[in-house]
Regions:
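Metal-dependent nuclease catalytic cores that hydrolyze phosphodiester bonds in DNA/RNA
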Residues: 1-155
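Metal-dependent nuclease catalytic regions and adjoining charged, substrate-binding loops involved
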Residues: 4-10, 110, 186-188, 196-305
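Short acidic (Asp/Glu) and glycine-rich catalytic loops that position anionic groups and cofactors
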Residues: 48-52, 174-175, 221-227
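Short histidine-centered catalytic/ligand-binding loop motif
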Residues: 57-60, 104-111, 177-189, 233-235
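Short, well-structured alpha-helical interface segments that form or flank functional binding sites
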Residues: 66, 152-154, 189-192, 196, ...
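Hydrophobic/aromatic-lined pockets within catalytic cores
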Residues: 75-79, 170-173, 202-206, 252
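Secondary-structure boundary elements
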Residues: 129-136, 161-167, 202-212
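Non-catalytic protein-protein interaction segments used by genome-maintenance enzymes to assemble
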Residues: 144-191
């Protein structure tokens, strides 16, 4: 067995995604994805999803991530990590599934032929638009590792061209609806991800503190493969920073004392949703074609129902 990769604090330009996701820092480290788990769930959930803390951890293989990963790789320089599985329209047949499993076992991204063609189309539009908008992609798929008061942090940047961090997002949502896009970004934890990446970059490059900028490059998954350049407003930046700090503080505490608490073992009284209360109260008093309870019971007693 080969020794797992272990890297010191700093910038590392050529780290395989498998090594990064296995946690290549000197000590068990926190990523933005795991920080999201700490904020949205509990420390125990984060422990279960950490490759170096949970001895039974198994990486997740999911076709929904394949297209995005392949586009990232293609934008970063080619198709060396992409395995094209030919002769199939989907993954339903056993032979296709066997080739997919073999590709994953070899550290490759399995794609059907039409999926690879889609990757090429998306990447072509992305590169063309980036050039037209004057966006420098700089170093792509590079890893930054930093220590924050005893807490080790790691981040894999899609594109790092100081002072800019560019984050590619391949999306099926409607990119034309700003309100829906903002909700999606917060629900997915993109606000905290941006704050986390900026924080790690500033720890590695302290001379850039206060000058690191972050933008999302949203790409449509389907034609016409449009690209939207999104930056966070002041509120999104501040809320992301608060969530990030909360996650780092919990990580540091749990790693230090070796305790990863789950849910509280105390009853918690949940508040009834305001909007559901209003909905029912309005129904009680509003004119309606539906019989009320008194009228309905009266008709039942009279044999009319």
């Amino acid at each position: 067995l080969t020794e797992p990769l272990r890297l010191a604090a700093g910038l590392h330009p050529a780290v395989a995604p498998a090594d990064y996701h296995a946690d290549c820092a000197i000590e068990p480290s926190l990523s933005s994805s795991l920080a999201k788990v700490l904020v949205a769930q509990t420390p125990k959930h984060a422990w279960l999803q950490h490759p170096r803390l949970n001895p039974k951890f198994k990486p997740e293989d999911d076709d929904k991530f394949a297209l995005g990963s392949a586009v990232h790789d293609y934008l970063a320089g080619g198709a060396a990590r992409i395995k094209i599985v030919t002769g199939f329209k989907d993954w339903k047949k056993d032979a296709a599934q066997e080739q997919r499993a073999a590709a994953r076992a070899a550290g490759l991204i399995p794609l059907l032929t039409h999926q690879f063609e889609q990757v090429i189309d998306i990447a072509a539009v992305a590169k063309e638009t980036a050039v037209k908008e004057g966006i420098s992609l700089g170093m792509q798929e590079c890893v930054l590792i930093a220590e924050d008061k005893g807490a080790w942090l790691r981040a894999m940047m899609d594109s790092f061209a100081p002072p800019w961090i560019n984050d590619w997002k391949i999306s099926k949502i409607n990119l034309a609806n700003d309100a829906a896009l903002a909700r999606h970004m917060v629900d997915m934890g993109y606000d905290m991800r941006a704050a986390f990446y900026i924080h790690v970059a500033e720890l590695v490059f302290p001379d850039l503190a206060g000058r690191i900028n972050f933008r999302w490059l949203f790409l449509e998954e389907d034609e016409p493969f449009g690209l939207r350049i999104i930056e966070a407003d002041a509120t999104m930046r501040e809320m992301g920073r608060r969530k990030m700090q909360y996650a780092i503080d919990i990580w540091r505490e749990c790693l230090g004392n070796g305790r990863w608490p789950h849910f509280e073992n105390l009853p918690r009284r949940l508040a009834y949703p305001d909007w559901k209360e209003r909905e029912w109260l309005e129904r009680e008093v509003a004119p309606t074609s539906v019989m009320g309870p008194v009228e309905m019971l009266g008709r039942m007693d009279g044999g009319q129902l």
